[in-house]
């Protein structure tokens, strides 16, 4: 049972993502309602990934972390650094809100979608992943779910890591966290990653011209943070990070024209915050700035040639979030202000434009006996399309101790991005995409097995589609998504099991055809065990068949790509109390498959790494 005393205690401790840590036996979550609460009190399905999980899985990318989670389906045009899309519960990749330390990821500004193939996994200390609508709390984009990547580190000392692997993979990382006096803590991280990659274009009948090359990826990252405690009530932080990435890829081209097959991405982010932690009241003010420059070009001509394209975006954010303990729960309220600016000459937005958004939200959670009630409402005032309101409500009933029924309903929306509004084929009269979602779930603890079964429906209207004849974007699409999600985790002796199954029927509501690149069924299984100090891990994933389009001829045709079963194997061994060595075999049985038509994925890959702490 969710004890009232537990709730009251959790609501009165430090809140918000910059300070969120696993300090409670009942893990605390910030992202669900923008105030800290026990995970057991969150009515929406939530998954938490820690830095220890990432190291155990030996993940070399954020996509490799997310693909293991319930409801997540990733389509990628090749290997490391290649363009990728994240589908949560069948929604578009633009319907996933990605936050970095609670702040919207800047790279989604022009394209409208967050491509996490470019974000360094070395910076990720924790991920809080919420499924379902969250626009009533966060505003635009939070239709399918929210992924909050938290970079705040709480690991004093220094760690050196080096890794090597297939396709000339190399990774070198140094991170340190030191106390500067009694009340100040400093963190520094530097990371270098390189791989020659492989030829991502699939062989035979895809319509792509032969480009027999290796499509590699290079990333350099630097991160720094200062945290200071002024008193028992007040604390603050300053943080900055940047990365410089280069990706080689294969693209369509015309003989005699430049071949645009190289991407160069520069990204930097800075933020500062001040936090008040009272006995019953918490308040936080955060201001942030981010700037990204995304070039696509032919390396023979350079990124400043007239044939090159540039997407340049600046994003400014101010967030004021507050929460107060009320009764056996919490009430939260806050204001978000955001400004996105494009620079003249941006590839898809040739002139300079800016878009402002101010959002005001109110959330509440109460524990009334065996019932948990949750509600939220938000109003956004956007400089392009005016005001838009969203709301959601959920109720949980613990009808037997340890067993709970949950019902929820919520509205959400996706604002048109700057490319759709002001690009060469843009339409400044676009309206937001709108969603209505229902979900019912049972969850419980049976004989040591923690489980949850959910059924949901999502109706999305005014979807923004490109009209081939009019050569403009219009609000003319509709989608209907129905799904079932089941999750479970349990221990059997030294073995830890994590299981999930997803059935997703995502369809165009007008043509009744499947939405592209989504698997209809997914099954995922993670097994971890310790034997004589060896930490073993095995991952199994079944990805069902999916549909895509073959654009090699006009009119294009729909193609079906078959399902696949994938196995990964990992092992780690602590040679000493300071030195740990790790090894991994990904795609153990060397399966050949595609998640984007015409682009092959990696075959069997090996990695070996070691880390030394002091």
From Swiss-Prot:
Kindly state the positions of the motif TonB box in this protein: 26-33
Keyword match Coiled coil: no
Motif TonB C-terminal box, chain ranges: 597-614
The principal localisation class reads membrane
Query: Signal sequence: where?
Result: 1-20
Q: Which UniProt keywords apply?
A: Calcium, Cell outer membrane, Ion transport, Membrane, Metal-binding, Porin, Signal, TonB box, Transmembrane, Transmembrane beta strand, Transport
* Record-linked InterPro entries: B12_transptr_BtuB, Plug_dom, Plug_dom_sf, TonB-dep_rcpt-like, TonB-dep_rcpt_b-brl, TonB_box_CS, TonB_rcpt_b-brl_sf, TonB_rcpt_CS
**Which taxonomic lineage is given here?**
Bacteria, Pseudomonadati, Pseudomonadota, Gammaproteobacteria, Enterobacterales
Q: Which GO terms describe its molecular function?
A: ABC-type vitamin B12 transporter activity; metal ion binding; porin activity
Record-level GO cellular component terms: cell outer membrane; pore complex
Instruction: Please tell me where Ca(2+) 2 binds in this chain.
Output: 213, 215, 249-250, 261
Residue ranges of domain TBDR plug in the record? 38-152
* Domain TBDR beta-barrel span(s) in chain numbering: 155-614
User: Could you tell me the Gene Ontology terms of the biological process aspect for this record?
Assistant: cobalamin transport; monoatomic ion transport
Residues the record lists as binding Ca(2+) 1: 199, 211, 213, 215, 250
- Quote the function comment for this protein: Involved in the active translocation of vitamin B12 (cyanocobalamin) across the outer membrane to the periplasmic space. It derives its energy for transport by interacting with the trans-periplasmic membrane protein TonB.
Q: Which residues cross the membrane?
A: 158-165, 169-178, 184-195, 217-227, 232-248, 263-277, 279-296, 309-325, 328-337, 353-369, 371-381, 385-400, 403-417, 434-443, 449-458, 473-490, 494-509, 517-529, 535-550, 558-572, 585-596, 602-614
Gene3D superfamilies reported for this sequence? TonB-dependent receptor, beta-barrel domain, TonB-dependent receptor, plug domain
Family as reported in the entry's similarity comment: Belongs to the TonB-dependent receptor family. BtuB (TC 1.B.14.3.1) subfamily.
Kindly list the places in or outside the cell where this protein is found, as annotated in its UniProt entry.
Cell outer membrane
Q: What is this protein called?
A: Vitamin B12 transporter BtuB
Q: Does the keyword Metal-binding apply?
A: yes
What membrane topology was assigned to this protein in its record? Multi-pass membrane protein
Q: Where does cyanocob(III)alamin bind?
A: 85, 92, 110-111, 251, 309, 517, 551
- Organism of provenance: Salmonella typhimurium (strain LT2 / SGSC1412 / ATCC 700720)
